[in-house]
Curated annotation (Swiss-Prot):
Keywords annotated in UniProt: Isoprene biosynthesis, Manganese, Metal-binding, NADP, Oxidoreductase
Function description: Catalyzes the NADPH-dependent rearrangement and reduction of 1-deoxy-D-xylulose-5-phosphate (DXP) to 2-C-methyl-D-erythritol 4-phosphate (MEP).
Molecular function GO terms recorded: 1-deoxy-D-xylulose-5-phosphate reductoisomerase activity; manganese ion binding; NADPH binding
Ligand binding (NADPH): T13, G14, S15, I16, N126, E128, G217
Catalyzed reactions per annotation: 2-C-methyl-D-erythritol 4-phosphate + NADP(+) = 1-deoxy-D-xylulose 5-phosphate + NADPH + H(+)
Binding-site residues, Mn(2+): D152, E154, E233
Protein name per UniProt: 1-deoxy-D-xylulose 5-phosphate reductoisomerase
Amino acid sequence: MVMTQRIAVLGATGSIGDSTLAILAAQPQYYDVYALSGYHRLDKLLALCQQFAPKRVGVPTTAVDDFAKRLSAAGLDIEVVGGDAGLVDIATDSQTDTVVAAIVGAAGLPSTLAAARAGKRILLANKEALVMAGQVMINAVKTHHATLLPLDSEHNAIFQCLPFAIQQDNTQIHRSNHGVRKLWLTASGGPFLQQSFTQMQQASVAEAVKHPNWSMGQKISVDSATMMNKGLELIEACHLFDLPENKINVVIHPQSIIHSMVEYSDGSFLAQLGSPDMKTPIAHALSYPDRIDSGSQPLDLFALNGLEFIEPDLQKFACLRLAREAMQAGTHATIILNAANEIAVSAFLNNKIRLTDIADINEQALNEIQVPLLTETADIDEILAIDNLARQYTDKLVARLA
């Protein structure tokens, strides 16, 4: 790498933002932080602006004026933009080379899709962009010659294990021509792997967000506890790698050392191993097709005491089953599932429902919400309309339990 990449980190104050910015700070010869965005943690965002001095920063619309004053008081000359429109403007800015799409949830969809339509290099951590708008997103990447590189450790691992020809253009090459039989997504099993369903019913928020291997935000930690995170990743993998859900298996691997695998027709399994540190897949995507130092601790093979592989219990982890069923049903169902899950997880984090109620609410939403089927040419307004309807309906489901 010789040219400096100008990076926009959307969702800079979250855990993915932390890991990304740690790498960017250590590699100033390769990367220039052009823009940042944040939503809740504006004090942290201000500190990041002081550290990296971006040209632009995105905040909630209601915070634009106040944040601009705070930047000015700190002696910083940074343009402040607000809301979804501001994020879209940053994502499509001609000065932006690479967009790190790390906004959590459906809120990240408009800016990620806009980046694809602007032909940007996109480092995708926001799985909802593909869960909600998979074919629309992939079509935009193809049509506008954008680049889409996965940041999720599992999808990044699969990407690394695929033949180079597929890495270069996974939208045009049939995997059968390269001997790919199946993809294997690994899952840690979360904090309740060894506990019964009855014990899960009594789980506190503090217990649910305490992941055994990874340091993550609250929402994704709860999704890991219910295995909805793996369900969303299964849907994402179908779109990213252009495979039906029956070609993608999920296996629980409690040590989180093997991050995913590709099974080939000759009987070979190619696996990507590494310490459970998000800086590794982020560094890979930032520098692809080259390699840079991620700053993570290398894996000590001699310290490993064995690797386990366990078939998921789909009664205990019903969210994983629901994700597969939603993928079979179509995009309208994956939108409903994602929206319902976001509302249900928020309710759990606010102590309104039990952890195990999340799957029940998700299943009710999938079974009861009636919406038109979406075509591959659906626009973002149609997608967001279903998302909004599902959220309103799920709010009512939560209210019945709260």
